[in-house]
Amino acid sequence: MWRLKIGAKGGDETHLFTTNNYTGRQTWEFDADACSPEELAEVDEARQNFSINRSRFKISADLLWRMQFLREKKFEQKIPRVEIGDAENITYKDAKTALRRGILYFKALQAEDGHWPAENSGCLFFEAPFVICLYITGHLEKILTLEHRKELLRYMYNHQNEDGGWGIHVEGQSAMFCTVINYICLRILGVEADLDDIKGSGCARARKWILDHGGATYTPLIGKAWLSILGVYDWSGCKPIPPEVWMLPTFSPFNGGTLWIYFRDIFMGVSYLYGKKFVATPTPLILQLREELYPQPYDKILWSQARNQCAKEDLYYPQSFLQEMFWKCVHILSENILNRWPCNKLIRQKALRTTMELLHYQDEASRYFTGGCVPKPFHMLACWVEDPDGDYFKKHLARVPDYIWIGEDGLKIQSFGSQLWDTAFSLQVMLAYQDVDDDDDEIRSTLIKGYSFLNKSQLTQNPPGDHRKMLKDIAKGGWTFSDQDQGWPVSDCTAESLECCLVFGSMPSELIGEKMDVERLYDAVNLLLYFQSKNGGITVWEAARGRTWLEWLSPVEFMEDTIVEHEYVECTGSAIVALARFLKEFPEHRREEVEKFIKNAVKYIESFQMPDGSWYGNWGVCFMYGTFFAVRGLVAAGKTYQNCEPIRKAVQFILETQNVEGGWGESYLSCPNKKYTLLEGNRTNVVNTGQALMVLIMGGQMERDPLPVHRAAKVLINSQLDNGDFPQEEIMGVFKMNVMVHYATYRNIFTLWALTYYTKALRVPLC
């Protein structure tokens, strides 16, 4: 029986270290004797239901840990479901009852350290690199036990498409990148190449898909790097990734410090392996894979021609003639000059040393999380190549369990955890509910624990040493996406957490306990002000430094805007909300700067509105998500339906897209297509519906014509399950426009948040 453990050390404690006693850490352990027959039957039923319905519902409901927590807390929903007939007849009591049912359920899912656990996954290129890395280093069976491997195979099979391939994400059409690396993953896990049946391996169908689409030479760059590392592709067939970039002066636009932090972290590990032309020691399996992945003999492949090949299914960001010429020039420089005597001795070796110095610094500063699950195995392998028995590699191994998540669909690798992000929003919901029912002491302990988690998770220092020289920006005052140990501050995580802390700070100490020191609130404000660009928008991880024209040269084929840091509407909206509240609570602290920030941020948001009244969402699906954060920011800045044309246009967009049921449902295709796209059959999604409902209420729709709001509320109330949960529907997160991410708690957060708005709106006429 798999169990989620919170805040546990576990594993190799010698090579595991923390900044705050592992607050927020999530790891899974298997104990065959830790369950009753009834519990095991419940888990098996959840697994079977997912497999049976996987063609219809492609993402998990994240049930295993939820069932565990509900059992441990002896949760029982005692409030009957509310069923709404006529939307116009919803009463305050109906709304509050549905809200209370959901709050009591959601409260039971809080961990003892104050955070809300959840999976943050869904990308199908997250798992295989870990398996490949552990296979090459000889640690596969040490890190991934038999039970781990069983669950990983379950996940692979559950998310294989009918045509035999795997998509970039669990709802996506088959793509070469994920089909190739997941095929390799199956083979490493012991699945025979020709074994194939509906319930079996799927290897033969995957191989057929690969060969029918031209073979593995059509894999995108990141996939080609992994194939080259494994020895089933040749480095000469890759676009160059020279380590010399880390030696360029700071005034160079190509200096590594100007890169987007996540791409920089990936590029750092890959460039070391590329610079050394590292190739794994051939094994019988590797030799077999060379024959299985290509329609032609391996020794007949023209690697120089394969360099720019990419399957049309993967090619989201087409490579222009300018790009091809640029990378051809870089290849000539890298291979014909820097990789030959005497430059290979004078420059390349120094570049490799510089790269590893930077890589070790980044790893130490993130407690060996690195930037996420994509750079992590590259960094881990680079450390092993440098010293197979060294502490750097062992420290990486110790953090692998932090990336593993177990759901009813199997074992998946997380981005790196969304503990802080989910918790900040969950606390927004709980605080809003407290405002609805301030006599309810049932959630007091929930609020206290949540506030404690935020307090313990804030970054209180900048990265160590000369962090600028080591390509790290400031961090003090920020909150991360996951936990404090990961160490990367994120602007909207900081804003949402600051907003919560400001609300907590306004509450009586006898209710909430010891309050956060005001200087730490100032630190958070300082960081948000620092993240604002000249155009008024807010970046995500670091201040914008890179030239945007560098995106024209991007070698990444399946994502967009990956080279330099950009500003985002959602981050900007969250920052306005937090700073507007801060201005009310602390009107004398950097007042002019905060007011200027809000003024410029409002202009930025207004300037990015689409002609139809919506805003494109960069981190969620998509126009509903972006519009919610944009309107929320504008309203916090004092804008209303009456005095703000963008809000009027946004409300009109929401009204025009409401379906006959009364809800909203947006397809993930809106993200890559950059055009509002309905779900098939114009069906409803409760997350989109919650976001849209809040936009309408913030836009004053209840005062003009409340019926659209009542209809939306009816959808949410009637969707609620017997235990107070809401149904898991389509995937709702996105990364760089084309990679979808699963946020399992969104179905609780945005529905309950919307019901707090609605319940308060119904209460107003009674006051």
UniProtKB/Swiss-Prot annotation:
EC number: 5.4.99.52, 5.4.99.54
InterPro entries the record matches: SQ_cyclase_C, SQ_cyclase_N, Squalene_cyclase, Terpene_synthase_CS, Terpenoid_cyclase/PrenylTrfase
Official protein name in the record: Seco-amyrin synthase
Key words, A-Z: Isomerase, Repeat
Gene3D superfamilies membership: 1.50.10.20
GO biological process, one term: triterpenoid biosynthetic process
Coiled-coil ranges per UniProt: none
Active site, renumbered: 492 (proton donor)
Residue intervals passing through the bilayer: none
Pfam families the UniProt entry points to: SQHop_cyclase_C, SQHop_cyclase_N
MF terms in GO: lupeol synthase activity; oxidosqualene cyclase activity
GO cellular component assignments: lipid droplet
Protein's job: Multifunctional enzyme that converts oxidosqualene to lupeol, bauerenol, alpha-amyrin, taraxasterol, psi-taraxasterol, multiflorenol, alpha-seco-amyrin and beta-seco-amyrin.
